[in-house]
From Swiss-Prot:
Pfam families associated with the record: DBF4_BRCT (PF22437), Dfp1_Him1_M (PF08630), zf-DBF (PF07535)
Keyword vocabulary terms for this entry: Cell cycle, DNA damage, Metal-binding, Nucleus, Phosphoprotein, Zinc, Zinc-finger
Name recorded for this polypeptide: Hsk1-interacting molecule 1
InterPro entries named among the record's database cross-references: BRCT_dom, BRCT_dom_sf, DBF4_BRCT, Regulatory_Dfp1/Him1, Replication_Regulatory_Kinase, Znf_DBF, Znf_DBF_sf
Gene: him1
Main location: nucleus
PROSITE patterns: ZF_DBF4
GO CC, any one term: mitotic spindle pole body
Amino acid sequence: MNLGRCPLAPRSANIVLPKHDAVSKQKEYRIEEKTNEAQREEIITWKDNREDEGEVKTDFEVVNNENIITTTPKHQTVITPKSYRKSVKRIKHDAPQNEDIPVMKGLAPINADTESKAESMAAGKVLGSKNSSQKARLQEWKRQYKKAFPHFRFYLDGCDPSVAHRVKKQIQQLGGHVETFFSGNVTHVATVRAIQDVSVKYAKQDVITKARQLNMKIWSMEKLCNRVLKTLMENDQCTTNAPTKQGNDLSYLLYVEKVQGTNERDLSVPRQDFVHFRGPYLYVHDIANIYKPILLREWQKPLPDRDVPWPTFRATSIGRCPFVPETKYRLSTSKSLVAKNDQQLLQRQSQEPSLILRANSMKASLPDISNTGISGMNTNTTYNTNINNTPQTAISGITQDTSPSIRTNCHHCLDDGMQASGIVQSNLTSAAMSNNSAIRSGSAASVPVVTINGRDIAELKKRIIQQKSGMIGKDYSYKAMLHNTSQRKIRVDAKPGYCENCREKFDNFESHIRSSRHRRFAENNDNFKDLDELFALVQRPLRPD
């Protein structure tokens, strides 16, 4: 009999077994508890006898004979003591002949519930191990992709602008780049078209065809958005949403600056990717970013006492350039001329009704002298149409010249002062030359004789002279105004520029073209020989006669 350790029990429990083979062969057993005093005494007596013989010393004791049942990994139940002292060195010895020592007689039967629980635990362990391995693989994939993402350059083919803006922001957050145009620098092409269908053939100049020829990665937008970016951004979103202790950590701030760029707002801090304008500037660039900026200029801030050097809109007169400042003298002159013209227009409008009333009164006061002869200077002088009494002299020529003016309508005489004055002069001349003689008219028929008093003619002459003097006064004032305006010295602003003929800059255009150097070049015909030859080539030929 050997005193050893039970192979199915804990290492610290020392149990006496009759034979080890009996443990594996028994199928059923009963746990018998001996709690009477006789059995206790027998155990104590056996212990004393063994100590007296000096064969073995053991600390094994049964305390109140209380045992517990423990489950081993192989689902076997054994009896172990509840409490024990420190283990001692195990020595092989023969088992005592007393068969009353408590021994383990068999294995406990396996319960169905215990077996199902054990199976579920085993399955859970297998699934847990699989999940842990998948998580480890996923973390490794994310680590590798995040490391390589700054070297990726994407080109989005046929993507919606709103979606493209969101995807571009996420790619830049991970350190990648989005190319505006397709080129050889692109590493990945993301498209909304079906790329799995091999039967579909695209044109030679198509982006998909070019990408396949250059061995680029071709991804669908679904893969890029829902699988790659979503997986890589999960931890980033969690860390940004949750409060972290690394908010002020230097390594974290350096990482954010590397991915998103610097957040510095101070204009005095230099940056590698931006140049800040410090003053007024003019910047004309291509909105599609195809060409470089067309025009770029920056002006320095002027001193308080000087004008601004950059172009600004100014209040100028009509026809003047709004960017060229106009002198105060020109502005005051233009304003005064406008005010004077407005005043004259108002005066003309106010004088028009009075002139109309005066003309109507003159028409009403004059008698109707149409188609009649007019008497001479004397009141009793008459124009007779008797052919026999009229001599054949040079008076007939005068009569022919004066008869049309005599027969004009009196209304026309009132409208035009010159015509009216001509009528009066011709009447007076004809009356003086006739010397109370009869003047023959153009027709042989009798014409009625009309007698006009000298008082009416004098009044008509007086009114015509007054009207003529008024018109002359107005003409004189208008001509005087024009003469004063022409004599007034007009101030011309200096026009600076560059003369390509003289190859020099000038401050005043008028003074430069009158300079000796410019005139010497302009008067030399050899300088314009090439230009004359060009004009001769493009000249239109004359039509042959």
